[in-house]
Amino acid sequence: MNEVYTDSSVALLLQRLQSTLGNCLVVADENWANVNWGLVRNTDQRSIHLISNRYDIAKSASTAGIDAYFNDFDFSALEPQSFDTVLFRVAKERATSHHVINNAAGLLRLNGRLILTGEKNDGLKTYVKQASKLFGDKASAEKSGAHYLASVQLHQQDAPALDDKNYAQTRPIITCDGLSLQSKPGIFGWDKIDRGSAYLIEHLPQFLERYTEAPTTLLDPVSYTL
């Protein structure tokens, strides 16, 4: 099912998906870039849906016949308590992982399962503990080489949510030449300005001077269904 460069934690989820039944939701970020979606199939006993913040991933999945959504992990179009399984390879950014785990609690039916994978350095064990507390479960991570997999079962839906830094909300980070530049959780390093970003901001006026008309549009990934 996996191509040569598929992330090993993603490969664990793909293996689990093969034996998973019911209504399944895959939450896919850049780690899923090299998956051959043509080999990830719906069956009479399994219906696969995908939500991704990467257009290429959502498009590939949609082309393979999978119900796919391209947006910034906006789950509002999905019916609450309608999934038996949610599969998520934890993200680089903590707020993103918390946001997905929180939403999984609302999307899963009671006794449904959130399947988490990642490496130790990704904080996988911490996320499993947090999800277990949120879900009212006592799950543990199983080791597979340098990667871990855990299955957290939903027993409650009224526990306090994890801190996702108000994930959906953009906020100003700096003003450049009278222009307020925005960022948000989910963008790695969103709450600080690194040297590369500072360089970009410093030279933004010169960049815009190249245009006879300044750019006025961008691709908005908030809600795009394939």
Q: What label would you give each PLM region?
A:
Residues 4, 145-216, 224:
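SAM-dependent Rossmann-like transferase core, predominantly class I methyltransferases
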Residues 20-34, 118-137, 211-224:
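Conserved class I S-adenosyl-L-methionine
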Residues 84-98:
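A short SAM/SAH-binding and catalytic strip from SAM-dependent methyltransferases
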Residues 1-20, 184-192:
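Class I SAM-dependent methyltransferase Rossmann-like catalytic core
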Residues 71-87:
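A short acidic, Gly/Pro-enriched loop at the edge of an enzyme's catalytic core
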Residues 98-113:
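A short glycine-rich, Lys/Arg-flanked "PGG" loop and its adjoining helix->strand segment in the class I
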